[in-house]
From Swiss-Prot:
It comes from the Bacteria. Its main location: membrane. Addition of ZnSO(4) decreases the activity to 70%. The chain crosses the membrane at residues 16-36, 50-70, 78-98, 121-141. It is a multi-pass membrane protein. It comes from Ectopseudomonas oleovorans (Pseudomonas oleovorans). The gene is habB. This is Hydroxylaminobenzene mutase HabB. One of its GO terms (cellular component) is plasma membrane. Its EC number is 5.4.4.1. Disruption phenotype: Mutants can still grow on nitrobenzene. GO terms for molecular function: (hydroxyamino)benzene mutase activity. Catalyzes the rearrangement of hydroxylaminobenzene to 2-aminophenol. Not expressed in strain JS45 under standard conditions, but is functional when expressed in E.coli.
């Protein structure tokens, strides 16, 4: 497992914060589009998904330096988090504009169904993002199992020092 330092964690943590606030903003803006949608009920879901998933990315960005994960697990968590959160917003946004989503979101869609291609795309997005978010949450929980591994060459070694 590669050790991570604050300087190596900072770019990904900052990127998660940027992507989180951007998705939060997209979620807010989606609320203004509801009257233009074929199914505003699913559009409301998109509005909420953007806002809530934006907050999830913000929370993940803030806790990022606390995660004890190797390089590969960190890259996977980052990629799955970004994909899962943005796909959730986009899939419900498209379903709202298309008047689709009845196959995967029967309650939210309120009986609206789209073409086979639209329903297939929405189904793929919702299933894949759900699996992605499960992986992200499992990795984050695993990463919080212990104190993060840090290498700090500026601080004195912990514990008793041998006599000189």
């Amino acid at each position: 497992m590669t050790l991570h330092t604050p300087s190596t964690d900072a770019p990904l943590a900052r990127r998660l914060l940027q992507l989180g606030i951007a998705l939060f903003l997209l979620g807010l803006l989606t609320g203004f589009l509801l009257p233009m949608m074929a199914n505003p009920r699913v559009g409301l879901s998109s509005h909420l998904e953007g806002v809530l998933n934006g907050m999830f990315l913000l929370a993940l960005g803030l806790m990022w330096p606390q995660l004890s994960l190797g390089t590969g697990a960190r890259k996977a968590a980052f990629g799955f988090a970004v994909y899962g959160t943005y796909a959730n917003w986009l899939a419900t946004l498209l379903a709202g504009f298309w008047g689709a989503g009845g196959r995967m979101m029967p309650i939210a869609a309120g009986g609206h169904t789209g073409t086979a291609a639209q329903e297939g795309l929405i189904a793929f997005a919702l299933i894949s993002l759900s699996l992605s978010m499960l992986v992200v949450c499992a990795l984050a929980l695993w990463g919080l199992r212990s104190a993060p591994a840090r290498r700090n060459t500026d601080a004195p070694a912990a514990g008793p020092q041998p006599a000189a």
